[in-house]
Design a protein with these regions (language model features):
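Long, mid-chain structured domain cores
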Residues: 49, 56-149, 153-154
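Flexible inter-repeat linkers and adjacent short helices
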Residues: 1-94, 109, 269, 273, ...
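Structural motif corresponding to the intra-repeat A-B loop/turn of tetratricopeptide repeats
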Residues: 25, 65, 104, 141, ...
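Residue at a conserved register position within TPR or TPR-like alpha-solenoid repeats
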Residues: 22, 62, 94, 101, ...
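C-terminal structural cap/anchor segments
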Residues: 257-294
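Alpha-solenoid helical repeat architecture
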Residues: 7-11, 46-51, 85-92, 123-132, ...
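Amphipathic alpha-helical segments of tetratricopeptide repeats
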Residues: 36-43, 75-83, 111-120, 152-163, ...
Length: 350
């Protein structure tokens, strides 16, 4: 005999699907309204599978908001329940746990849970979001070949289901992968295509456009075309919304220093350093402090950079350790201090 659903159960299931759909598009205001309605309706739902799905989607909601402590706590509670999970709920559990690890910059752990989740995925329409996030995790883990493979897979599903937001995100990610392997022409083409995808004026599309501007800035920054980089980072910083504000602000500041626009660079340095302290973002507090010592307070460069590298080493931020250690190694090589240069070269490949 099939499961008999009440009108309330049917309405609630449809509401959960709407909730998940808006979260996949990062529409925070709509998700917040649906979260309140779901919380109110839950008490009238009698089917455990549906309630478990609601609990899992609540975890996903806190991941979207960046409330990782809450998401982790709810995940621990969910695991303690020892529930028997349907195929879809097993997929959500593995997938969302992977997302918690990803947001905490544990790329390999994220990949492990994403690969488990792939075994339970059943709907083709869901595969766009899944393969995009899998591709993003491979990119962060420094495996561009697998990132490109999965981003192309996600893009095929996005095209098939007319998921324009994800199509633009895939182009952005593919652009970054080509930038990573120094295929600048292809990277530029993909990033402009991603920018051209954004014709709407909703907040999600505007934020995606600002991400495209940031990545174009990064493309020119890496090629040391700093004047062009300034133009794109400036557009990213002044976009509303801008989910990557501190990152764009940091690169804008460094680009301005490099083209000798000192007073403007100092203006953005003050904004960035103050903002990072207000938000208690230690990663960017150190990044801005090290930038200041590199271009302004050069007498304290060595000491502050050594402390900064030690900080990034302590939090296992391998990308930052590699980047700053390589800079220090080159610096000491030019000074003829071979022992210190060798130390930082070794640290760069740690």
């Amino acid at each position: 005999m099939g499961l008999v659903l009440s009108v309330t159960d049917k309405d609630f299931s449809e509401l959960l699907q709407d909730f998940y759909d808006v979260m996949k598009q990062e529409k925070q205001e709509e998700a917040a309204m649906l979260a309140d309605i779901i919380d109110t309706m839950k008490k009238d739902i009698g089917i455990e599978e549906v309630l478990l799905k609601a609990d899992l989607l609540t975890i996903r909601y806190h991941v979207m908001l960046g409330e990782l402590l809450t998401a982790g706590y709810l995940l621990d509670q969910f695991e303690a329940g020892g529930h028997f999970l349907s195929q879809q709920n097993e997929y959500f559990y593995q997938y969302f746990k992977g997302q918690v690890h990803f947001k905490n910059k544990r790329w390999n752990e994220a990949l492990r849970y994403y690969e488990h989740a792939e075994l339970y995925i059943s709907e083709d329409e869901e595969k766009t979001d899944f393969y995009y996030k899998l591709a993003h995790a491979y990119y962060r883990a420094g495996i561009p070949v697998l990132s490109v493979l999965n981003a192309n897979k996600a893009m095929r599903y996005a095209t098939s289901y007319k998921q324009h937001y994800h199509l633009a995100k895939c182009k952005l990610l593919l652009g970054l992968n080509h930038l990573e392997i120094r295929n600048f022409e292809q990277a530029e083409s993909l990033l402009y295509e991603a920018l051209d995808c954004q014709h709407n004026t909703d907040e999600t599309s505007l934020d995606l456009a600002s991400m495209a501007h940031h990545n174009l800035g990064l493309l020119y920054f890496v090629q040391q075309k700093f004047e062009k980089a300034v133009d794109y980072f400036d557009q990213a910083v002044h976009a509303t919304p801008c989910s990557h504000y501190l990152k764009s602000l940091y690169y804008l500041t460094e680009s301005l220093f490099r083209v000798n626009h000192h007073s403007e660079a100092m203006k953005y340095f003050q904004i960035g350093f103050t903002r990072s302290k207000k938000e208690q973002d230690m990663d960017y507090q150190w990044a801005f402090a090290m930038l200041h010592k590199q271009f302004v307070d050069c007498d304290n460069f060595e000491a502050v950079w050594a402390e900064g590298i030690a900080y990034y080493e302590a939090i296992d931020d391998r990308y930052s350790v590699h980047h700053y250690s390589l800079c220090m190694a080159d610096y000491y090589t030019l000074k003829g201090e071979e022992e210190k240069a060798n130390y930082y070269y070794r640290l760069a490949v740690w």
